[in-house]
């Protein structure tokens, strides 16, 4: 069967840019052919962060939905122009959207992503697949994470026991085996990025160097690790609606002492490393492949190696683009009416065809 061309769009909880990828996909492979990281406007980022903190109006939700749709379409068109690609050669765009709120538990669980897919379809001239999470949640699932299904497609078929760790704003683990498992371990980069932005006027702590200059505040670390999320059994998923500025400030206030900013950064890095290693070590895996922005944090990777000395840790191929590739692949699955194997990951009653199609 001939390979088909799909585009994937991902904008994660870190809000550091829009990742757009071009993939060639068939039943056995998904090959990355091109990618671009499109800048996220500062004013839009600030507005979304304000909305995620629970302060927004219906008018804001509507206008930001359209603004994001325009931003995502501009990002796609930039890739097409750079690579000199005819839009007619693309079967579909898979768009994750920008998560505004993820509420997987309660009487009426939901997950809200913004980024009007109709606007993307009109402005690019390409069919769009979006709204992936809703069907899974209607079937009783968490609606996240979805990457494990793609990880199994991409990295499965080996005799070695392999886990994949994606470190984005949140961190999620995929455990490959007879039964596919995957869930969010907790915060990835989100708290570190938030803290360094507040104190250093940069968007992230390059290579974890600022964290490296500090010392762990153990009472703070222990208090944060007592959060019920970390002991909650999987399936589970989380986001900025849980691990955010208010959550961190609550723990800082409880220390009743003046804390050095670089020591807090060091402690936040340790929180990410320990919460990840606590989960990875449950599965007795031989190999851990890292992807996502956190894979470029040298000090975080170093700490993971120290906490898990018997596991071979490496960086996955195309590590920066695997999340966006996931949604290109999910678009392929939708257009071919193929079920996505996620019920053991999300807790849904059955596997399903995911996503709505916008033309």
UniProtKB/Swiss-Prot annotation:
Enzyme class, UniProt record, top EC level: transferase
Gene Ontology biological process:
1,6-anhydro-N-acetyl-beta-muramic acid catabolic process; amino sugar metabolic process; peptidoglycan turnover
Q: Which SUPFAM superfamilies match?
A: Actin-like ATPase domain
Cysteine pairs forming cystine bridges in this chain are none
Residues that, per the record, bind ATP:
12-19
Among its keywords, does the record have Transferase? yes
Catalytic activity, reaction form? 1,6-anhydro-N-acetyl-beta-muramate + ATP + H2O = N-acetyl-D-muramate 6-phosphate + ADP + H(+)
Question: What InterPro entries does this protein map onto?
Answer: Anhydro_N_Ac-Mur_kinase, ATPase_NBD
Q: Which UniProt keywords apply?
A: ATP-binding, Carbohydrate metabolism, Kinase, Nucleotide-binding, Transferase
Q: In which pathway does it act?
A: Amino-sugar metabolism; 1,6-anhydro-N-acetylmuramate degradation; Cell wall biogenesis; peptidoglycan recycling
- Coiled-coil residues: none
Carries keyword Magnesium? Answer: no
Q: Its Gene Ontology molecular function terms? A: ATP binding; kinase activity; phosphotransferase activity, alcohol group as acceptor
Report the EC number(s), separated by commas if there are several: 2.7.1.170
Family classification: Belongs to the anhydro-N-acetylmuramic acid kinase family.
PANTHER family found in the cross-reference section: ANHYDRO-N-ACETYLMURAMIC ACID KINASE
Function of the molecule: Catalyzes the specific phosphorylation of 1,6-anhydro-N-acetylmuramic acid (anhMurNAc) with the simultaneous cleavage of the 1,6-anhydro ring, generating MurNAc-6-P. Is required for the utilization of anhMurNAc either imported from the medium or derived from its own cell wall murein, and thus plays a role in cell wall recycling.
Write down the NCBIfam families for this protein, in alphabetical order: PRK09585.1-3
Q: HAMAP family, from UniProt?
A: AnhMurNAc_kinase
Protein name in UniProt: Anhydro-N-acetylmuramic acid kinase
The organism that produces this protein has a lineage beginning with: Bacteria, Pseudomonadati, Campylobacterota, Epsilonproteobacteria, Campylobacterales
| This protein's encoding gene | anmK
């Amino acid at each position: 069967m001939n390979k088909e061309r799909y585009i994937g769009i991902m904008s994660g909880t870190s809000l550091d840019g829009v990742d757009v990828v071009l993939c060639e996909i068939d039943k056995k492979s998904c090959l990355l052919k091109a990618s671009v990281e499109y800048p996220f406007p500062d004013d839009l980022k600030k507005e979304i962060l304000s909305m995620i903190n629970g302060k927004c109006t219906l008018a804001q939700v509507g206008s930001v939905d359209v603004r994001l749709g325009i931003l995502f379409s501009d990002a796609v068109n930039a890739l097409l122009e750079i690579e000199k690609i005819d839009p007619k050669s693309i079967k579909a765009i898979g768009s994750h959207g920008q998560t505004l709120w993820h509420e997987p538990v309660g009487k009426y669980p939901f997950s809200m992503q913004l980024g009007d897919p109709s606007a993307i379809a009109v402005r690019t001239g390409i069919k769009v697949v979006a709204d992936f999470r809703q069907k899974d949640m209607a079937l009783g699932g968490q609606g996240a994470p979805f990457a494990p299904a793609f990880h199994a497609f991409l990295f499965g078929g080996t005799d070695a026991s392999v886990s994949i760790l994606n470190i984005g704003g949140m961190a999620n683990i995929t455990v490959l085996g007879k039964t596919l498992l995957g869930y969010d371990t907790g915060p990835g980069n989100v708290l570190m990025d938030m803290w360094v932005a507040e104190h250093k006027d940069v968007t992230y702590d390059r290579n974890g160097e600022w964290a490296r200059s500090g010392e762990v505040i153990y009472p703070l670390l222990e208090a944060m690790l007592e959060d019920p999320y970390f002991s909650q059994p999987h399936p589970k998923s989380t986001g900025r609606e849980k691990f955010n500025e208010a959550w961190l400030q609550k723990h800082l206030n409880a220390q009743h002492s003046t804390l050095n900013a670089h020591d807090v950064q060091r402690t936040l890095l340790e929180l990410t490393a320990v919460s990840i290693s606590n989960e990875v070590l449950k599965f007795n895996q031989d190999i851990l492949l890292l992807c996502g922005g956190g894979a470029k944090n040298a000090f975080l990777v170093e700490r993971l190696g120290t906490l898990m000395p018997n596991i071979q840790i490496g960086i996955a191929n195309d590590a920066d683009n695997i999340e966006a590739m996931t949604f290109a692949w999910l678009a392929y699955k939708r257009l071919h009416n193929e079920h996505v194997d996620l019920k053991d990951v999300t807790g849904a009653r059955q596997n399903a065809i995911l996503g709505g199609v916008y033309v």
